[in-house]
């Protein structure tokens, strides 16, 4: 309402600016229409022709209101407790550690998992720029992101829209993710479970699914078996990050489209909006494989527990 009515995307500068209608024809597109356009866009793929028919807008107006709606969503919900990307309280982290310990008893101090995600990007006409986004292993162009996932399915830490040539561990370094995970470890003793991509050095606040904690240095056979079991449980726990990536991409098929190359910040704002919607959906709707697996009690219906 107020954000939509008090701003306009039709300024001569191309920016979204504060505006008050004092004369002339009012906009026929209402706030609900703009929000619906943004949400339907996230749930579809391909060109916008179908959305033109659904919303009755020409291509130019549809593109303008889509850009307008995405920015209004980010501005409205970036500090909302249901949608924001934030590290939970110490009490909540303790419940996350308990949730992991139920399924993985040897990882009783794990509170989250982390992994990287590559999203397709159009090639730039400039060879030097194109090289930044090219990944030689998969022979394509990407933007790279790193996300952490909690047992309730939410994203507490994220860093996205990094050129595809950057390794996941470097993304975590550039995005200050390692420092934030270390702060959580120092304050609560909680660790994050990752795969072998995150750093060659040992970090005490990370569980690596391939990390040889003791290996042949273990003095007894029992300790070697315990070390092997811990690595297997870390591998199993890290699967939650794959579920989270799948949940993010299946919830928003638009992510599977190839992003248009531009340098105006559209990708960053779009990715930020999708993460906010994902968190809000995880907290309010609760349809999430991670949450259903690790914290099924959050989905219990009181009607099934109370006998009338």
Predicted regions and their residues:
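Short, amphipathic alpha-helical "recognition" segments used to contact nucleic acids or chromatin
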Residues: 31-44
């Amino acid at each position: 309402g107020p954000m939509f009515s008090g701003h306009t995307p039709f300024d001569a500068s191309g920016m979204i600016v504060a505006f008050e209608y004092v004369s002339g024809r009012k906009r026929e597109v209402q706030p609900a229409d703009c929000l619906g356009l943004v949400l339907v866009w996230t749930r579809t793929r391909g060109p916008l022709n179908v959305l033109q028919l659904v919303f009755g807008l020409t291509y130019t107006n549809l593109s303008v209101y889509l850009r307008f709606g995405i920015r209004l969503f980010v501005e409205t919900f970036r500090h909302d407790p249901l949608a924001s990307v934030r590290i939970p309280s110490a009490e909540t982290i303790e419940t996350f550690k308990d949730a992991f310990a139920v399924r993985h008893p040897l990882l009783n101090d794990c509170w989250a998992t982390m992994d990287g995600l590559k999203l397709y990007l159009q090639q730039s006409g400039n060879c030097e720029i194109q090289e930044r986004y090219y990944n030689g292993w998969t022979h394509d162009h990407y933007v790279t992101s790193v996300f952490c996932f909690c047992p309730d399915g939410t994203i507490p830490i994220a860093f996205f829209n990094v050129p595809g040539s950057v390794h996941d561990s470097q993304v975590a370094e550039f995005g200050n993710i390692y420092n934030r995970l270390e702060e959580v470890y120092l304050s609560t003793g909680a660790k994050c479970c990752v795969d072998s991509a995150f750093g060659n050095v040992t970090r005490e606040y990370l569980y690596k699914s391939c990390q040889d904690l003791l290996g042949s240095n273990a003095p007894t056979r029992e300790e070697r078996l315990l070390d092997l079991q811990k690595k297997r449980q870390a591998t199993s726990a890290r699967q939650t990050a794959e579920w989270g990536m799948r949940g993010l991409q299946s919830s928003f098929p638009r992510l599977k489209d190839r992003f248009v190359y531009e340098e105006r910040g559209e990708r960053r704002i779009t990715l930020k909006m999708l993460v906010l919607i994902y968190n809000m959906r995880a907290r309010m709707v609760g349809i999430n494989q991670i949450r259903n697996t690790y914290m099924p009690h959050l989905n219990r219906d009181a009607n099934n527990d109370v006998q009338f």
